[in-house]
Design a protein with these regions (language model features):
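N-terminal low-complexity/intrinsically disordered extensions
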Residues: 1-5
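Patatin-like phospholipase
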Residues: 6-109, 141-146
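A short alpha-helix-loop-beta-strand transition element characteristic
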Residues: 73-78, 115-126
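Helix-loop "lid/cap" segments that line or gate small-molecule binding pockets
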Residues: 110-114
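Active-site gating loop/helix substructures
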Residues: 119-146
Length: 146
């Protein structure tokens, strides 16, 4: 039998795609059933949400229940009208750090509640979240903080 030090390291990388990234929970169910440990989790955009749930070490069913509470029709149906104007008329409605097609106030509230205030410090598996710096367009890797 392989010890943890002998076995290959496993990194689970979850790309972007909004709630479609929840498919990663199905993969986690299989990994859990087969007793395959994940050594690090990486997520981008919607994938960062599920990477975070996995990195916290929550059982898959708890992550599924949290997903069902966070992603409801009232959250996904909210549109940011100003953002549509910013896309259509960028020379009048300038882009800034508040740009987003979906109004994020409700989403942020749901995520704070869903994650129960968890931070990177509480993850059981190392977590890396990739993002884009809006000021210079460069990739940023976040692995600590709130």
């Amino acid at each position: 039998m392989m010890t943890k030090n002998d076995r290959p390291r496993v990194a689970l990388v979850i790309g972007s795609g909004s709630v479609k990234c929840a498919a990663a929970l199905g993969l986690m169910k299989v990994l859990e059933r087969e007793h395959i440990d994940v050594d690090m989790v990486v997520g981008c955009s919607g994938g960062a949400i599920y990477a975070s749930l996995i990195a916290l070490g929550w059982p898959v069913q708890r992550a599924i229940d949290t997903t069902l509470k966070m992603w409801t029709r009232d959250v996904t149906a909210k549109r940011n009208t100003r953002a549509i104007l910013q896309l259509a008329l960028p020379w009048i409605f300038k882009f800034d750090e508040s740009f987003g097609l979906i109004n994020d106030r409700m989403i942020n509230r749901r995520f704070r509640d869903g994650f129960e205030g968890a931070t990177f410090a509480q993850t059981r598996i190392p977590l890396f979240v990739t993002a884009t710096d809006l000021y210079n367009g460069e990739q940023v890797v976040i692995s600590e903080g709130v």
